[in-house]
């Protein structure tokens, strides 16, 4: 797919493409066969900030736009779907915190990704699967408190 990127975006794309070609593509195939975790690849990706692309500038991220992020993600996915998924899945955990968290929570979540960590988005409803839109639990404000109704199970 073609993207219209600014000069910074083009430079980032070239860097990610080179990294994926040299470090990810063939090596991840070998790890798929061996079943090992390619820690050194993910450590290098973390050093490059690839797991924290969506951290806003105000919390220490590079503040790239969605189009540039999409181009970088596409390049990662071309190299290896598992690598792409690992690098982007933390954003599922980050988004709700950025939307509804307080400043301290937002900074904490962003720092985890900026320091090479990972986030996880987990649903605890029976039959929850991976569709948060299908959740049945409700939270209704009752005075100063919330009344929560629903069924939960642990992952």
Task: Show where each model-derived region lies.
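A non-catalytic, amphipathic alpha-helix used as a structural packing/dimerization or gating element
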Residues: 8-22
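Intrinsic disorder at enzyme termini
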Residues: 1-11, 139
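Glycine-rich flavin
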Residues: 23-155
